[in-house]
Amino acid sequence: MILGVNIRNFDVFEDDTIGLLIEDSGKYVGKSREDNGIRLRNLNALIGRNNTGKSAFIRALSYVKRSLVTDVAKASTTDNRPGFMNLLIDKNKPCEFRIFFRIRDQKTGHSEFLQYELTIGASEYGSPYIECEKVLSSVKNEDGSLLIKEVYENSSEARLISDEKVTALSVLGKLNGSESEIRQVFEEIDGWFFCAFSAEESSDYYSAGNAPGAHKHLNSDGSNVGNVLDYIKSLGEGEYESLMNEINSKIPALRKKKKNLPLNLQGSPEKLFKYLLLLRDPHPKTTIFIETPDRDLYHDMVDVLADDMREFTLNHPYSQIIFSTHNPYIVEAMSPKEIWVFSRDFEDNDDAVRIRCAGSDPVVMALFEQGVGMGAIWYGGHLDQGSSEYDEDGVNNAH
């Protein structure tokens, strides 16, 4: 799972961090996993007004995965991206991504803390190339302090991969002889799933590359749901019936209510069905990214989805969900430490993105500890003000 991300000079992000990076991890030595400060958690909500960077954050991480699956040049023009130079804020500087993970070691079962760093520069012709890649490991010493060691570095001066557009991680991560940390980071990013069930325009089934027959996993827009159900049915009629009964029992008055819903909500039961099916995949994704999963869902369906997302993260402690929303209902039962507020001052010349954790605001924490739900706190305007920022110790860091 992702503990933190830093993005520099890419899209709307000049130098912005969400969560915890490896260089700051030493301050949390000795604390329990549930209480180790302001970091991304198993369930995370991105909130804020329109055009504040929530969708851009998800798109930026989609770009990282696409760079690994294909290469940095193709990633810059697929998924409606406008080309690499148009993704840079400062055309004379590279963009950089730093992503800090907590990953389960498949052999020992223990947590590994690893950071992947990717720097992409532009040639004189504006085409992207890999300037530097690193994998760092955070290791606890006998005295309890943390040692940060470099597992791998691939720079333009000492490249192992001849194609400068291809990431070394995408090659070495598939080799059994590579360092285990490299394979773990690759598998973690390769397991990201960018869910578009609630997208305003879904891809056509065949143009999305689907084929008839049984499919093990849902695709990004859920258009192959029938194929996935065929696969589950092939495993055994009893297993199929059990899954269908469980999911259908969670969808409120599925057939009755649908007749009386407004037109834009009549697809809600099917949309909720896809989410519930995704969350029951026996081989869960490492991180599921969803933009506005509550879009067009009836309010009681939002409650069902929120409960099931929570249950997913409890059942899969090394997986996580990161979603954006404008709906207070879906965050009502969440913790302030699971909510990230994006803001921008459009009256300022640089209209820079600012990201803060709701759990770093002592006023919000006090309200939450008194029993006020996060949806009510948000509806009351306590999350949108953004007039001051606090660190986890309650120190005001506003400039």
Predicted regions and their residues:
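Short acidic, glycine-rich loop/turn motifs
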Residues: 7-9, 99-108, 137-139, 346
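Hydrophobic residues positioned within well-ordered beta-strands of beta-sheet architectures
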Residues: 3, 16, 97-99, 114-116, ...
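Short polybasic amphipathic segments
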Residues: 5, 97-99, 127-139, 259-260, ...
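Oxyanion-binding "anion nests"
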Residues: 253
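Electropositive, glycine-dotted interaction segments
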Residues: 107-250
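Conserved P-loop NTP-binding catalytic core
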Residues: 39-43, 49, 56-123
